[in-house]
Amino acid sequence: MNTLKDLKIGKTARVIKVHGEGAVRRRIMDMGITKGVEIYLRKVAPLGDPMELTVRGYELSIRKEDAQMIEIEA
């Protein structure tokens, strides 16, 4: 299973599924990361956390632990 955490800088991927439960999953989906949406990885902080993404035309930063819950198709 490929997750958003595995995506390389400068690449685009499509979300297949958002894993997790409860408030964490809801928060990810509230940020606009839902099934079928395209995500572009702009950059990653020097220590790998957080990751800066472009989602639905806006900039978004998420933690690696949240990125692991997002299954992608590169």
Task: Label the model's feature ranges.
Residues 1-74:
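Compact, glycine-rich, soluble single-domain proteins
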